[in-house]
Amino acid sequence: MAPAVAVVAAAAAFPFRLFSAEARRNTKGSRSKRGSARPLKPSPPPRPSASSSAAGGGGATTFTRLPLRNAPASVEVTLDRFPTANPEPRASTFTRRNGERLGDDEEDEEEEEDEVELGLRGATTFARLPLRDSPDGGDLTIGHFDAGVAPQEGLRSRAISRQLVEHLDDVEEEEEEQVVSRLDIFEGAKGREARAFLPDEDDEDDDVVVFDPEYDGYSDDEEFVATAVEQSPRGDAIAVAELEKLKYDNDDDDDDDDEVVVFHPDDDEEVDVFEDYDDDEEEETKEKGVPAVMRCFDTAKIYAKAGDGGNGVVAFRREKYVPLGGPSGGDGGRGGNVFVEVDGDMNSLLPFRKSVHFRAGRGAHGQGRQQAGAKGDDVVVKVPPGTVVRSAAGDVELLELMRPGQRALLLPGGRGGRGNAAFKSGTNKAPRIAEKGEKGPEMWIDLELKLVADVGIVGAPNAGKSTLLTAISAAKPTIANYPFTTLLPNLGVVSLDFDATMVVADLPGLLEGAHRGYGLGHEFLRHSERCSVLVHVVDGSGEQPEYEFEAVRLELELFSPSLVDKPYIVVYNKMDLPEASERWNKFQEKLQAEGIEPYCISAMNRQGTEDVVLAAYKVLQKDRQRMKDDEEWNGPENLNHVADAIKRERRAPMNEFEIFHDKGTNTWNVVGAGIERFVQMTNWQYSESLKRFQHALEACGVNKTLIKRGVKEGDTVVVGEMEMVWTDEPSKTRSSKTMNSKDDSVRWPEFG
């Protein structure tokens, strides 16, 4: 008992012609395969064939070709409904009532069709089909809208008789249990796309499906299939509309009329095709994230890869009067290294917002006459002072670069493969074997900046921190009379004498709960850990400056207990305001009772700021002397320890391995840095490489260990990138020549 669904396909530039009744009868027998409909139903009823439909079978299908504007191809829209009990085909775009035609005279009907055709030139029509097994057929109407008008403005009629809904309310229970697929709306590149989902039992809302075929990336010869199912308020299917094939020319981006719209069956309000889909449920409000500029100021994630080594070559000396020249294949060049260098001119990680991938060059391949390949180009990642380098995989701190000019080797390049000249021996004077270059290490790296400032200015929002920085340095931060004016840390250099300077950082304001993520201060609290001295600015115009001072101190302690142990200076600001002057004595007495001597200033009038600068510099000199003594005691720091660890792993012996057995698949995995590196550098295009690999497995004890663990014939053995099938026949696993070869063929040269 599925009522008809309204389908609108707009064609702006070409007239639309209705098929006559006789033409429709003729087209039923030659129904196009592209126009076949597929109801989105788990167990659809049997569909009538085209021949049975033409002979007066139970089902009826109409299809209409709508030419798109500026497109040589066309759109085929198919309406499919379930078979009816009436054997007469009911495919018609004209109004029917109780299953009968309005006019008994066929000539009158043809005249009416001609009138409709003339009246709808340049417009689009949509058809409504009668209900399945409906005793009265329902009231079905025809509506249209002008193609030159926007769809939501030109719609003339979409009314379906309320009898359809009333009839569906009386449907039997067994038919209510009929499960069909439902559709939802998903945003696309241009427009929206309809996709099918299984319905929920409690979901009784009607679905409105709006499909816009204008998508980026589709060429003229590509196709898109869209299917829509309308549901009644009780959940059973009304009708199915399918856009089987769509071909269009997307050169004209202004063609907004080529659309297929499926409307509510019982909603008289216009459906806005171009507006967002509105389902009466309230959308969840997402918190606004940190802006990209702030997020990338002191954190970044980059990808670094060292260069692969060049391949060795197989070559022989061919020279006049030298009949037995011997092997002359050269070794491949070493891959480029990845360095991390501190650039004193940088003060943020914003350059890494667009530059993410850093790849060193690959070593050149070897050549004849024992010519080794050239080394790959190195790549240098420049970072500001105070950058911490961590591994993104394990969150392990790798490096901490503090001073400008520091340079650390992060990833060493891969070793070049050996040519056949390196495999020459007394028993093998003309080797036909060479190695591939070693792959360079790669990793994702997290960069975190902790500004290297001598003095850090902290405090509540709108306390006058930026104003103080402007008064004591040449920095020009944004200053305004509202909280959170400072969104990013600002740096300024304070000069006392010709050779006495200090760097001062103005940090964003702190709120109560900043250590848990409230406000903006928690994003930049890490920068205060680098500061030798903290200047705590208190807003004297506040109602409770004592409470503000204690709250900020508590937030610093909760974020990092080491911040409380740092020397700090308390500055009472805005003494130019009367209310601040009135509260100064009370604030001073409270802090003096705790052993703290505060300073009162007016940063706006630059009164009292010199005393603050001298006090901070005095504390800074003591801290610099302490750090210098510690550095002389501990000695210079090794910045290449990450590369040294990679080199040690490369020198791992081949006899250090582990074997893991997967009983479900009878797979034996041999894991070891040395044996896996051997497999990766083996060039399998040479027959001698396989013999060398078989001997290596025997020499390092892999075969012996597998036999002890109970490997059986037919099991799979995986060593690095090589996968083999184990066999007990010695003739298939190794040859006599391999057994007689020397162990020198599997040894590695020292890493250089």
From Swiss-Prot:
GTP binds at residues 459-466, 484-488, 506-509, 573-576, 602-604. Residues 453-621 form the OBG-type G domain. Residues 294-452 form the Obg domain. One of its GO terms (molecular function) is mRNA binding. Its cofactor is Mg(2+). Residues 26-36 have a biased composition (Basic residues). One of its GO terms (biological process) is thylakoid membrane organization. It comes from the Eukaryota. Residues 103-117 have a biased composition (Acidic residues). Mg(2+) binds at residues 466, 486. It is found in: Plastid, Chloroplast. Disruption phenotype: Severe chlorotic phenotype during early leaf development. Residues 19-121, 728-752 are annotated as: Disordered. Residues 740-752 have a biased composition (Basic and acidic residues). The keyword Oxidoreductase does not apply. The keyword Chloroplast applies. Keywords: Chloroplast, GTP-binding, Magnesium, Metal-binding, Nucleotide-binding, Plastid, Transit peptide. It holds the Pfam family MMR_HSR1. One of its GO terms (cellular component) is chloroplast stroma. Residues 1-90 form a transit peptide. Belongs to the TRAFAC class OBG-HflX-like GTPase superfamily. OBG GTPase family. Probable GTP-binding protein that plays a crucial role in chloroplast development and is required for leaf greening during plant growth. PANTHER family: DEVELOPMENTALLY REGULATED GTP-BINDING PROTEIN-RELATED, GTP-BINDING PROTEIN OBGC, CHLOROPLASTIC. This is Probable GTP-binding protein OBGC1, chloroplastic. It comes from Oryza sativa subsp. japonica. The lineage of its organism: Eukaryota, Viridiplantae, Streptophyta, Embryophyta, Tracheophyta.
